[in-house]
Design a protein with these regions (language model features):
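Bacterial N-terminal signal peptides
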Residues: 11-21
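Secreted, disulfide-rich extracellular signaling modules
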Residues: 2-8, 21-410
Length: 410
């Protein structure tokens, strides 16, 4: 084998090893051997501004629906939107406008997250007679921006019931029985695709919580509506009663969180049910990345501030596209910081450290192609929504956050 080719291959393998070995170093590490045609550098940028803030909790796309109270959280009500076509036959709701179709009744059901009933309060169901097809937004609706008064008075009440149809497993459902007048109310001639949303709430205040499956829980029984009907074949012949099932496609719990704690506001905090997010600004103002350089990693590093063992807790991050307010902890009715989803990244906490690799956006910033307003941190929907994570901020003398960039330069 050509000696020069063999030597270059050895150099490449050595560089790979150096990248791994020096990934935890903060100082620049030039590879100065005259025989090596590339240089490996590591540079650290300080986080100079950091702040947590709160927005109304947005609980869409979580696995569960919550009612009642838990640990200071008030679960006011749940909003549920149904699919426009039935699960198996693909029957649209307009099917029931046919004069040969007689709707006998409807049953709206939610699957309880437990297989036993200890306390069985009464729930009530409302709908939206004046709403179109977009009563709520699963990703944006919350206790501040949603107007509950647009819902009807309650149209049905229900309680938990055990279903023993499956001999291998007992399931518990919350069932609401509805008569055909509800379908008639839905079928306003001015609404071609009539409203398919419901509001479910406890009839009375409860001190405990009641948890149900949402439409996002994989392999579970999400909310559904069954429409029982008969069909006339002719004036004198009518088929037996059958039904169509319509599954929920959007749902969320509207919750009011407890007051913010001192820890929530003094550390960098993230948590879905508390509505907590954080922003940080990395000082990269005077940095210009050599056009020939290739960044292998650009880790934004945070240290976990709780004495707890975590597994599979994921934090997501993006650059923000407007200036942040880093003066003090604030609460907003709406998130004021828009994200650039093109640079979305996520990672899990490992050994009490969170290392978010922003290699792509760091390259753009280093090439002076992107304005650096900072980065947002928020919790992933896959986490426990009631778990708030705390990280040390810039006032910590030993565990302050930092961005560490490793790059190779020919």
């Amino acid at each position: 084998m050509n000696f020069f080719l063999l030597k270059n291959r050895i150099i490449v393998f050595c560089l790979i090893g150096l990248i791994t070995f020096f990934s935890c170093e903060e100082a620049a590490i030039p590879v100065k051997d005259d025989g090596i045609p590339m240089k490996l550098d590591t540079i650290s940028f300080p986080v100079i501004k950091a702040m947590s803030y709160q927005v109304p909790p947005e609980m869409g796309r979580t696995d569960l629906l919550y009612f009642g109270n838990k640990d200071g959280y008030n679960f006011s009500y749940n909003l549920i939107k149904l699919d426009s076509s039935s699960v198996t036959a693909g029957t649209p709701f307009s099917f029931y406008n046919d004069s040969l179709i007689i709707v006998d009744s409807l049953k709206f059901s939610l699957r309880f997250d437990s297989d036993s009933i200890e306390n069985n309060p009464e729930f009530q169901l409302r709908y939206f007679p004046d709403g179109g097809d977009s009563v709520f937004n699963e990703l944006e609706s919350n206790y501040i921006n949603f107007d509950k008064s647009i819902a009807s008075t309650f149209i049905s009440t229900g309680q938990l019931e055990s279903d023993t149809t499956d001999t291998n497993q007992t399931k518990v459902f919350l069932n609401f029985l509805l008569d055909s007048s509800i379908v008639n109310a839905f079928k306003d001639t001015n609404i071609t695709d009539f409203n398919r949303s419901f509001l479910v709430e406890l009839k009375n205040e409860e001190s405990e919580s009641f948890i149900f499956h949402s439409s996002d829980k994989v392999g579970a029984d999400g909310p559904q509506l069954k429409v029982y009907y008969r069909q006339f074949v002719s004036d004198s012949v009518v088929l037996d009663t059958t039904f169509r099932t319509y599954a929920a496609i959007e749902d969320l719990s509207i919750i009011i969180p407890p007051p913010i704690s001192t820890d929530d506001s003094s550390y960098l905090s993230v948590g879905t049910a508390m509505g907590l997010k954080s922003i940080v600004l990395v000082d990269m103002v005077d940095w210009i990345l050599d056009p020939r350089a290739i960044i292998s990693s650009a880790e934004l590093i945070f240290n976990f501030a709780l004495d707890d063992t975590l597994q599979n807790y994921t934090v997501i991050s993006y650059p923000i596209i407007n200036e942040g307010d880093f003066l003090q902890f604030s609460s907003f009715d709406k998130d004021p910081y828009d994200e650039d989803f093109n640079y979305y990244t996520s990672t899990s906490i490992v050994e009490d450290k969170l290392k978010i690799n922003h290699r792509k956006i760091a390259t753009e910033i280093g090439h002076q192609k992107y304005n650096n307003y900072g980065f947002k941190l928020e919790t992933s929907l896959s986490n426990d929504p009631f778990r708030t994570m705390l990280f040390y901020s810039i006032d910590s003398p030993d565990y302050f956050p930092v961005m560490r960039v490793i790059y190779v330069l020919p």
